[in-house]
Amino acid sequence: MAKPRLLKLAGLVLIVVLAAAAYLLLWPVITQKAEHRLAAIGLTPNEVAANGPLPGDVSLYLKELACAEKLPTPGYYRSINGAELTDAQRSGLFTCATFTGAFSGPNQVYAWRSADGYQGASYINNRKPGELYITGGDFPPASGPIPAGPFIAKADATTGRQIWRTYLDNGNASGAWIASTNLNILPNGNIVTAWANQVVLLDGDTGRILKHNTLPTGPTGAADANYKHLTIAPDGTVILKDQTRPTGCTLQGTMAILKCSMEGMKQGASNMVAVHPETLEVLDSIALPEPATVPHIIAMFEGKIAIYVGVNSGALRYFWDPAARKLSQDKSWVVAPMQKGQTTSDAPSILGDWIVLQTNGIGSDTVASSIVVAHQKDAAKTKVIFPFGPLKPGEWSFAPPKPQTDPENSMIYSADMGVGKVAGIKLDQATGEMKTVFVIENSTNAFQPLLGPKDQRVLLLSNFKRRVESEPLKLALFTGNYNEQVTWRDAATGRIIAESDFFEPLTLGSLITPGFGGRVYFPTGKGFIAMQVMPAPTAQK
């Protein structure tokens, strides 16, 4: 009897040993798979496909940087995007950025979120490959407690892991109107940024505040001024202009301008200042005759530094004289592009000798949006086109983004979120005549940046989709009750080349920013999503 019992005991011991060995060998694999499945819950197919951070094509980094360093961007750090929007002309043209997908043929979009959160991320800039700068904290709720900000942060360009963050304000404590700011990198790598009536210079390596100044706001009180618009002149002088919140409005955020204007409140006139890029000394200040809600651009005109300003009634031209340290208005050049029923024009764009304007920047229930071009030498020489035709009963035209231009291809791109369409327009640069080349169904209120070479230009568009289809567009926009995706399109035809999954909304008024190695960055209310397009993998047998 003893022997069978011993054999049974030995068998039990062997089973236990084998079970323990199996546990030790297999449990890490089982755990890893379980953790992977848990981590994948809530991810979109684009994120599942990436399964981790996206470095992009690292073989392109030095080539793209060398290309960018050859571009004429005086006043700005030479990188793929060292300015709020490419350069002083805010051209939105990124010829050194690479589209890594197939121009014709199926593509796969990969996406991955930043490791750290950046509330209200709005603009993202590159310096060297691997370096990413983010402005955020400037997209608060309209009322109630607001997040601290604005802030500037530096992050790893692949993981989104924060390196440093510098907070500039806290509206709960200061009482300041906190609205959108922008981000520009100086040639020496430092950062100049402004908000409310304040301007600071930051060390681009450490985030330390090097200089600060308070800016005059002219005819409008400081409580309703926001020096969001900052552009650098060819001589290096920083030209700033403020947005103004309607008098009596107490809402926070940039959308306060639209919401309170729709309630009949009136904006005060804007102010423009010239500031030294190193000392932040105010060199000159000039009051504008009316509000200027949209950004200005800077270009050379007949040997002078010209500043084209979109104002609520149209567009004006100012000159900056570095020798005299003087800002002045050119009263011979005034454009009034709006027809009865249309609203303010958006920020101007340049195409050859023409200044391009988009109407209905704050919306119209009665008249469709139009594109107007005015000659730089003669403001009376204008042409107009209605790319989407007349406004139908019950439609709302809302076209807040500036028109995108492509001088090499003589193309203009117009986006009207209200009617849910984007148009490609061909301009005859000799005569100013325009012809609509294509109209596509794509609802966006964002910029329309262009990537790559002249013969294979790629148009980047966000695409807005309401979560409740029957919900009025205005309500969905004001409450953020919608999702948004990125589409990559053939800029010549509007044809979709690739499209991402739908994510939370792109931060209002921000840019889908091209990065090194074929990546783009999609800023959101929580941080950013890096994306890359690659040719779709062939199916494995």
Show which residues each predicted segment covers.
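Sequence/structural signature of beta-propeller modules
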Residues: 16-109, 533-541
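Beta-strand-rich domains and repeat architectures in extracellular enzymes and scaffolds
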Residues: 64-152, 172-182
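Repeated scaffold domains used in trafficking and secretory/extracellular systems
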Residues: 116-125, 172-183, 219-232, 290-300, ...
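Blade-loop segments of beta-propeller domains
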Residues: 117-123, 136-141, 147-190, 196, ...
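Short, conserved, GDST-rich strand-edge loop motifs in beta-rich repeat architectures
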Residues: 135-149, 242-266, 360-368, 462-481
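Beta-propeller blade signature
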Residues: 149-160, 207, 257-280, 317-321, ...
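Loop/turn-rich, solvent-exposed surfaces of beta-rich toroidal or solenoidal domains
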Residues: 397-424, 437-491
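Blade-level signature of beta-propeller repeat domains, shared across WD40, Kelch, NHL, RCC1
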Residues: 496-541
